[in-house]
């Protein structure tokens, strides 16, 4: 069986592709740049042809929130690119798995279900939602598609907005928390998402749109306190009053702080998911999300100079 993985140089694919190959699948990695697991170099915003037969396509390639590229670049990759990959899936009659994002919901009340109203905030969420709508168009014409709305994906090797927190932990500096820190903020261990993608190979769920938000976590205060202990740091949590959120959003817009307006709209609220539909597929989470953050902190400390650039 042949599986095409787009975004083969990306974070999720780096864990997914070796597992697929170990299980005996023929894997075609596709990315716009060369990489360890990339066999086809191609800009997915352009028409795509693959000579090989393809049974499953796992579409991971996307411009991400923290890349802060132009709206046009977001649309070219996340919307036009998704349609090009769907065209390929249609020509191969391949089962298509689209990894979308829980950011399509905006910042609603928790727990969030698949019936929660969609309200995408920002170019990333909007373009991923548009990608979902294109998937539905192909699904209506008979293509087998599963849409996974994933929460933030964390694990060893990824730092993103957390590298500032990790540096503060290393320097025994304050850990800033927006609001009182009693809110629960959900995220996904990368290995859980990888295992679910592999699970879908034997347990196809065409027509399913499902949230994949990770186990319901502890509060932000509890999570950061665990990291302080794990990192043997003398850092302390400092709470930032919500009255200053307007200033933080301005600083984010000016790219002075390493977060986006969407991050600021959710990080002080409960943001977690009802897992009933996911569990009905037969899959259960296998990894503790806090361990993903601990792995990231370990990675940061072991690769400090390199990590600063990631």
Q: What feature does the model see in each segment?
A:
Residues 3-23:
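N-terminal Rossmann NAD(P)H-binding glycine-rich loop of SDR-like oxidoreductase domains
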Residues 44-80, 84, 88-90, 105:
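NAD(P)H-binding glycine-rich loop region in Rossmannoid oxidoreductase-like domains
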Residues 84-123, 146:
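Conserved Rossmann-fold NAD(P)-dependent oxidoreductase catalytic core, especially the SDR/UDP-sugar
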Residues 119-146:
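Active-site Tyr-X1-5-Lys
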Residues 155, 177-183, 210-218, 228-232, ...:
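Glycine-rich Rossmann NAD(P)(H)-binding loop
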Residues 158-164, 178-201, 207-208:
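Substrate-positioning beta->alpha
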Residues 190, 249-284:
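Conserved C-terminal active-site "lid" loop/helix of NAD(P)H-dependent oxidoreductases
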Residues 199-259, 294-297, 303-310:
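Mid/C-terminal beta-alpha module of Rossmann-like enzyme folds, strongest
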């Amino acid at each position: 069986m042949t599986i095409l993985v787009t975004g083969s140089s990306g974070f999720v694919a780096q864990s997914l592709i070796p597992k697929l190959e170990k299980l005996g699948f023929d894997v075609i990695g596709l990315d716009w740049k060369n990489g360890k697991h990339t066999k086809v170099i191609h800009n997915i915003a352009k028409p795509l042809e693959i000579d090989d037969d393809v049974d499953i396509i796992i579409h991971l390639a996307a411009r991400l929130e923290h890349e802060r590229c132009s709206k046009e670049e977001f649309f070219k990759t996340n919307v036009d690119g998704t349609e090009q990959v769907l065209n390929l899936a249609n020509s191969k009659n391949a089962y298509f798995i689209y990894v979308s994002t829980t950011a399509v919901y905006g910042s609603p009340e928790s727990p969030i279900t698949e019936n929660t109203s969609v309200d995408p905030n920002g170019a990333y969420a909007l373009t991923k939602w548009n990608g979902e709508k294109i998937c539905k168009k192909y699904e209506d014409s008979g293509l087998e598609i599963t849409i996974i709305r994933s929460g933030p994906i964390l694990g060893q090797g990824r730092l993103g907005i957390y590298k500032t927190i990790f540096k503060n932990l290393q320097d025994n500096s304050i850990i800033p928390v927006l609001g009182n820190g009693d809110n629960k903020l959900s995220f996904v261990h990368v290995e859980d998402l990888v295992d679910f993608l592999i699970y879908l190979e034997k347990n196809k769920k065409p027509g399913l749109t499902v949230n994949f938000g990770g186990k319901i976590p502890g509060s932000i205060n509890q999570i950061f306190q665990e990291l302080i202990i794990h990192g043997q740091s003398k850092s302390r949590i400092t709470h930032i009053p919500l009255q200053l959120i307007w200033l933080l959003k301005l600083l984010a817009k000016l790219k002075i702080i390493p977060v986006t307006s969407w991050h600021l709209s959710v990080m002080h609220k409960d943001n977690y998911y009802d897992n009933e539909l996911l569990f009905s597929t037969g899959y259960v989470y296998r990894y503790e999300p806090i361990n993903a953050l601990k792995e990231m902190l370990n990675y940061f400390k072991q690769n400090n100079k390199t990590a600063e650039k990631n």
